[in-house]
């Protein structure tokens, strides 16, 4: 028989112990996921840290890796943050000159030069920025079978309104002179450029004010002769004397970003300089440095020079330059004009006689330009809208240009007969030049310029006659990068 009493007791024990067993099993099952979560969390933290280390290593490598860029206008190296750069650039101008009147009539001076090819500019150069603050440029020129350092300067750009330049750079006076060599619309600059300095050594403070509507430059320079550079001094790129040039230029774009769109391309300015310059002679009376210069046509023929030999004319006192200037660009049309006034104190000693005077030379020019292919004119030459591409339909840009320029020498330079400051036979009192040209820019890098220039002279030949006009055809094949 079954012992129901015993079975009842066993059943009660099973019932009493079952919940505890179930709870224990549940506790074990709950503990397993918690441990798994902790383990996964640790693994995730390790992976995250490894990714952080990899990102830090990649950032460090990127910061020390130079970025190379190559485009249609330059090749450059830059730091990853772009604050330090070096750009490799070049300008090559290969010219041809052909004179229509190769032989001057008998008794006439100023015979034209020889027809031929020449390398007018060969300028590989570097420029860039260091640390996002200081810009620099170093530009030599190997044309003419010699080496000349054209530019060598640094510019600390503290603010748009405050930049400090030091080194050798363009004097801040002439409008066309300050235009880049690949931006000028003619092969050679106009006659007013003969009266203002090219490049000089010194320091300059400049910047832009009123959101770019007004720019200024104030310079303290060694001083260069009319149309000359400091490398043309008796000791190249060294000062000739203790006196310095003080130069100032203001240029305004009064309607820049104006609602009057047609006036946005109007620019008005004035530049000038002042100094004291005294030339020197040796024991024989010959000039060791006259601090004066000769004036040449764009065919590179001398049409005015001061007397030399043992009784030379030399600079002797104040030299002042003043140049009001303006341009206007609207659509495909452009206009540029400038006037230059130079007052120069001179001296000539002949035996016991000394002659001194203040000579006032003046020059002006006006030039017109028009893009037949529709590009927008500007102070800087624009890139062609449809550059030439092999197999494409573009043939670049076509620009027509015309210019009229005058340089008038002070008549006092010819007074005094044999005691005059210049010899009237070989020196003209006035030059007037008309230039017509066409510019074909195949691409942004290649351009061909063709000019015909007709220059007439007042005086310059024996007996007070006018020297023969210079008629010269100039061609330029230009490469820039």
Model-derived segments and spans:
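Short loop/turn motifs that connect adjacent beta-strands in outer-membrane beta-barrel proteins
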Residues: 77-86, 133, 161, 173, ...
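Surface-exposed extracellular loop regions of Gram-negative outer-membrane beta-barrel proteins
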Residues: 112-142, 209, 213-222, 325-343, ...
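Outer-membrane beta-barrel pore domains
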Residues: 2-3, 31, 262, 272, ...
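Residues on the lipid-exposed face of transmembrane beta-strands in outer-membrane beta-barrel proteins
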Residues: 77, 90-92, 119, 124-128, ...
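N-terminal periplasmic/intermembrane-space "pro-region" immediately following the signal or transit peptide
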Residues: 2-4, 25-93, 101-105, 251, ...
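Surface-exposed coil loops of outer-membrane beta-barrel proteins
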Residues: 104-110, 159-251, 255-260, 280-314
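Residues that define the transmembrane beta-barrel architecture of outer-membrane proteins
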Residues: 71, 84, 111-122, 148-150, ...
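Surface-exposed loop and membrane-interface regions of Gram-negative outer-membrane beta-barrel proteins
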Residues: 57-68, 96-122, 126-164, 173-181, ...
């Amino acid at each position: 028989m079954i012992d129901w009493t015993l079975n009842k007791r066993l059943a009660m024990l099973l019932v009493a112990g079952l919940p505890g067993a179930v709870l224990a099993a549940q506790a074990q099952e709950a503990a397993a996921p918690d441990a798994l979560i902790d383990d996964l969390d640790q693994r995730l933290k390790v992976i995250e840290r490894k990714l952080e280390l990899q990102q830090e290593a990649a950032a460090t490598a990127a910061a020390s890796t130079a970025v190379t860029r190559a485009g249609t206008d330059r090749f450059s190296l830059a730091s990853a943050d772009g604050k330090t750069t070096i750009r490799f650039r070049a300008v090559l101008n290969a010219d041809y000159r052909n004179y229509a009147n190769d032989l001057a009539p008998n008794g006439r001076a100023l015979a034209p030069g020889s027809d031929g090819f020449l390398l007018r500019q060969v300028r590989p150069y570097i420029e860039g920025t260091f640390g996002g603050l200081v810009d620099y440029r170093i530009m030599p020129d190997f044309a003419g079978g010699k080496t000349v350092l054209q530019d060598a300067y640094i510019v600390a750009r503290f603010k748009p309104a405050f930049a400090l330049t030091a080194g050798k750079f363009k004097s801040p006076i002439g409008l066309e002179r300050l235009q880049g060599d690949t931006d000028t619309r003619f092969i050679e600059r106009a006659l007013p450029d003969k009266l203002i300095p090219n490049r000089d050594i010194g320091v300059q403070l400049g910047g832009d004010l009123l959101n770019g509507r007004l720019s200024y430059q104030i310079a303290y320079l060694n001083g260069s002769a009319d149309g000359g550079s400091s490398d043309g001094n008796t000791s190249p790129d060294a000062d000739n004397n203790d006196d310095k040039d003080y130069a100032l230029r203001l240029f305004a774009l009064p309607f820049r970003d104006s609602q009057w769109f047609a006036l946005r391309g109007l620019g008005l300015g004035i530049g000038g300089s002042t100094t004291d310059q005294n030339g020197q002679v040796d024991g024989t009376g010959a000039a060791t440095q006259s601090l004066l210069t000769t004036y040449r046509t764009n065919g590179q023929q001398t049409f005015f020079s001061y007397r030399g030999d043992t009784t030379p004319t030399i600079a002797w006192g104040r030299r002042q330059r003043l140049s009001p200037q303006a341009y206007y660009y609207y659509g495909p049309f452009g206009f540029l004009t400038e006037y230059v006034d130079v007052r120069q104190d001179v001296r000539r000693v002949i035996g016991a006689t000394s002659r001194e005077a203040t000579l006032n030379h003046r020059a002006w020019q006006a030039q017109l330009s028009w893009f037949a292919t529709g590009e927008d004119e500007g102070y800087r030459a624009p890139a062609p809208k449809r550059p030439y591409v092999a197999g494409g339909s573009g043939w670049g840009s076509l620009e027509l240009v015309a210019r009229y320029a005058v340089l008038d020498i002070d008549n006092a330079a010819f007074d005094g007969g044999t005691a005059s400051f210049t010899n009237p036979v070989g020196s003209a009192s006035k030059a007037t030049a008309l230039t017509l040209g066409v510019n074909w820019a195949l691409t942004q890098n290649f351009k061909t310029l063709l000019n015909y220039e007709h220059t007439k002279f007042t005086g310059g030949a024996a007996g007070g006659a006018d020297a023969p006009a210079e008629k010269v055809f100039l061609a330029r094949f230009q490469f820039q990068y």
